[in-house]
UniProtKB/Swiss-Prot annotation:
Name of the protein in question: Triosephosphate isomerase
Alphabetical keyword list: Cytoplasm, Gluconeogenesis, Glycolysis, Isomerase
Encoding gene per record: tpiA
Keyword Iron found: no
Pathway: Carbohydrate biosynthesis; gluconeogenesis; Carbohydrate degradation; glycolysis; D-glyceraldehyde 3-phosphate from glycerone phosphate: step 1/1
GO biological process: gluconeogenesis; glyceraldehyde-3-phosphate biosynthetic process; glycerol catabolic process; glycolytic process
Catalytic activity annotation: D-glyceraldehyde 3-phosphate = dihydroxyacetone phosphate
InterPro entries per record: Aldolase_TIM, TIM_sf, TrioseP_Isoase_bac/euk, Triosephosphate_isomerase, Triosephosphate_isomerase_AS
Entry EC no(s): 5.3.1.1
Binding, substrate: N9, W10, K11, G176, S216, G237, G238
Active site: H98, E170
Assembly: Homodimer.
Amino acid sequence: MQRTIIAANWKMNKNFQEGLQLAKEITQFIQAEPLAGAQIILFPSFIHLEGISKLLTPEVKLHLGAQNCHDQIAGAFTGEVSAAMLASIDVRYVLVGHSERRQNFAEDNDLIAKKIDAILSCKLQPVFCCGEPLSVRESNQHYAFIEQQIAESLFHLTPDELQQVIIAYEPIWAIGTGLIPSLAEIEEMQQTIRNILKKQYNTVLADNMAILYGGSCNASNITKLISLPGINGVLIGGASLHFKEFIHILRSL
């Protein structure tokens, strides 16, 4: 049975001290109230990674992820951070393909595929984000849109490589808006994603892929979201920045 994955994307929030304090509070909670059925991954800003990594011990069931990395392992890329650098400070996961990276930095499926290769080459796990804008959903083209994102970003991977990928379905129109698809729509989309993978790979692999839902997840809807049989967890944004709300989410598992 897969654990429920709770991935917390802090985005560009919290200064160094604020981020470290929040991470300390979360680790103290996990030590006091172990969550046997959950896998918790924090995705703070780059400035927090090393400090938070020092809080992690075998007793603290908390994992560390980065919000981005470069597609090359090293070189003259001013301002960039490589997957190899992240691996050196105990980062285990890297977000890739998030809609904010696609929209604000013009990252396309080809670049995302290269980033995934770099992440895997450093023995890290990619958390691959896919999702459609509202205009695509309203024109009933969302299935084809998601299939193209997956095909161009993931289909070059071997089955063994694909098994290392976590997929996060985040409809763009639901991110930070308070809007959320119906439970039936979320369940339908996760099944669509699995069907896409079945056609390219095989049923066993597709059925065992970890698929998360992201987009306006919070304490009021977490129980319903994680009750969906095909959803293996959630990717949380704003709600993960507030200790009390995040703990409420964890206690709902």
